[in-house]
């Protein structure tokens, strides 16, 4: 598996992204993988990598980039910690359709320049918070 990272410039700032694609000759069908409200974490990245193993170039953008540099979410205590819940909800509130559509234009442009990705047709998947964004 080829894993990497890239910063994609949008109208609202620089989005840190993870990339995955199978080894060997591409280009591979492109997929944008929208995260859930728990953010970028090992479980989410493992899911994106599994998708890439099926023959896709997967881009996983950190949709919380508008919050600036933020401390990693504490998934172990989130359920019982009102302060952590409030912090997550503040970041989720920044993920709105209009902003994501602007970001998506930059992600599509990234695929057009990426030789390992097919940019003619691009899939979008999302989980939880990312599901409605994918639609």
Where are these regions (language model features)?
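N-terminal cap/leader regions of alpha/beta-hydrolase-fold enzymes
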Residues: 1-135
């Amino acid at each position: 598996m080829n894993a990497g990272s890239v910063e994609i410039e949008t109208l609202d700032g620089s989005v840190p992204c993870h990339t995955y694609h199978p080894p060997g000759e591409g280009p591979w069908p492109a997929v944008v993988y929208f995260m859930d409200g728990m953010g970028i974490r090992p479980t989410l990245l493992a899911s994106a990598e599994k998708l890439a193993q099926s023959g896709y170039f997967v881009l996983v953008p950190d949709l919380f980039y508008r919050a600036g540099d933020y401390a990693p979410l504490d998934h172990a205590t989130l359920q019982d910690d009102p302060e952590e819940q409030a912090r997550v909800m503040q970041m989720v509130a920044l993920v709105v359709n209009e902003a994501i559509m602007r970001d998506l234009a930059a992600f599509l442009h990234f695929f057009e320049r990426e030789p390992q990705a097919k940019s003619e047709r691009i899939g979008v998947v999302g989980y939880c918070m990312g599901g409605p964004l994918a639609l």
